[in-house]
Amino acid sequence: MTIEKIFTPQDDAFYAVITHAAGPQGALPLTPQMLMESPSGNLFGMTQNAGMGWDANKLTGKEVLIIGTQGGIRAGDGRPIALGYHTGHWEIGMQMQAAAKEITRNGGIPFAAFVSDPCDGRSQGTHGMFDSLPYRNDAAIVFRRLIRSLPTRRAVIGVATCDKGLPATMIALAAMHDLPTILVPGGATLPPTVGEDAGKVQTIGARFANHELSLQEAAELGCRACASPGGGCQFLGTAGTSQVVAEALGLALPHSALAPSGQAVWLEIARQSARAVSELDSRGITTRDILSDKAIENAMVIHAAFGGSTNLLLHIPAIAHAAGCTIPDVEHWTRINRKVPRLVSVLPNGPDYHPTVRAFLAGGVPEVMLHLRDLGLLHLDAMTVTGQTVGENLEWWQASERRARFRQCLREQDGVEPDDVILPPEKAKAKGLTSTVCFPTGNIAPEGSVIKATAIDPSVVGEDGVYHHTGRVRVFVSEAQAIKAIKREEIVQGDIMVVIGGGPSGTGMEETYQLTSALKHISWGKTVSLITDARFSGVSTGACFGHVSPEALAGGPIGKLRDNDIIEIAVDRLTLTGSVNFIGTADNPLTPEEGARELARRQTHPDLHAHDFLPDDTRLWAALQSVSGGTWKGCIYDTDKIIEVINAGKKALGI
């Protein structure tokens, strides 16, 4: 292309440049006290507000900042001018607008700022996944900086939907200890009337490669899986789980998680949230009053009852850290999961695969909380953004018209009984729902691992509730190698796939959903186990062990495994105990203790290395989170610890 094709000829209007303007009409509502005592920035802020078109006579209202993860550019009729990364952030500008109008209607002044977010589905199996988890930390930092950069704000509303943008928003709000804050969940997209959900459809490549899907079927299913333009995926993955956790923390209004994006109830939630945060400000209730150790534990309880994503084992600790609360450890998670029953039957865990919009209609978080209240598993005195406690909110919910009408809507519209989506405890037990998360250890994972035990296919679990698998190892030093082996039909029934180098130092702790989803939706996949130092998408199911620690690149035993080694796995879904052990080879069987000694003698896999395309930004994140406590502390930045380590290093180096 020549420069002439870039700078095309223009008409006279192009050259008619105006060099001055009359400026806004009126005068700033200044007082002598303001001129004498206010910082110049506050005064100039009023000038900027008038310059952007706000009525100069209405510049003394309560300023409320709305932060959001909106992406893309929508035309007035909703058509895309420029696409976003995903449906989850495509429509939330409508919620932000609804909240802003409500603030204005009540005499306030709304401000808005944006930090958009990536799509973990879009980046699965690509180098984009290397930025996924580090993005959460970066976005939380930018959000906090934006909040502090508007020093006149009286309250903050966060609007977000998906896997990393929503946790980042919650972490940012949690750090605003002395401000009223509230979270507006971005809701859920609808499932297609005929077709597949956004989780299963991500396996069209693997199923086509294994001759289980035609090209035409793949093309049609892929086209319609996101059946409405806004909202998070239809399953209870990391996005959906983060929404219910926000509500459980008391940071979002009751019955606000998982609402169908773009619909009247979804918009009204934004307006209600604007009214609520203004009331919090009037009453002097701040984030510090809401995010307590009790709130954190309520969130862990709801996570277990919903059967939530294992990624929240990274996000809830990070929220707790930002809020100044106690960071939950493995023992705390185990204690919660052993006593809290899973009550929700939705995608991807089942046993009935309802989309999350049905969980919303069945009553969502407050309906689950009613059952947990009766079991004595909640802190009912925890404060929430309604200005009332959890217990008071539940009293309202139980007798509300909202509850009755939405549950009836589910019966009439879909022919589904609400208690088949959110099950009473006895019914859940009778249907075989088991507790959510387990932390197996062993000579491969001496510092632990994570499995969503409730999501192991029941057909491969014994009558005693224990999953046993002893099989030969297939070692892969990258996810790309592993998915290629699946597509080339090189994995056979009974294999144990081990993917190493996927921890923080290798890939930024990438998600490996294309592996777990392929194993779920290929007919023989349930007979294969997966072990990795990477993590999993919230929609992952099956005998998949992630977060293996220490990671391979830190010298962890997982990095010393070789093809044709034998691994023995046991996971008790009832007691939530488990083990993952190397037990030698077919020719040289070993006990777990002998296996540990053998692994200690071995060298790390010769092909193991950090990914060639790992960004420097992610390498820095990996180093900072490592000295801050690593994955078991939520991959946080502990500033004091980081400074301590840097100073010690400078001293040792004589800098």
Swiss-Prot record:
Catalytic activity: D-xylonate = 2-dehydro-3-deoxy-D-arabinonate + H2O
Alphabetical GO biological process terms: aldonic acid catabolic process
Highest rank taxon of the organism: Bacteria
Enzyme Commission designation: 4.2.1.82
Enzyme class: lyase
GO molecular function: hydro-lyase activity; xylonate dehydratase activity
Expression triggers: Expression is repressed by the transcriptional regulator XynR.
Disruption phenotype: Disruption mutant has reduced ability to catabolize D-xylonic acid. YjhG-yagF double mutant cannot use D-xylonate as the sole source of carbon.
Swiss-Prot/TrEMBL keywords: Lyase
Pfam families, per database record: ILV_EDD_C, ILVD_EDD_N
One cellular component (GO) term of this entry: cytosol
Similarity comment text for this entry: Belongs to the IlvD/Edd family.
Function: Catalyzes the dehydration of D-xylonic acid to form 2-dehydro-3-deoxy-D-pentonate.
NCBIfam families named among the record's database cross-references: yjhG_yagF
PANTHER family: D-XYLONATE DEHYDRATASE, D-XYLONATE DEHYDRATASE YAGF-RELATED
Name listed for the protein in its UniProt record: D-xylonate dehydratase YagF
Species, as recorded: Escherichia coli (strain K12)
Gene encoding the protein: yagF
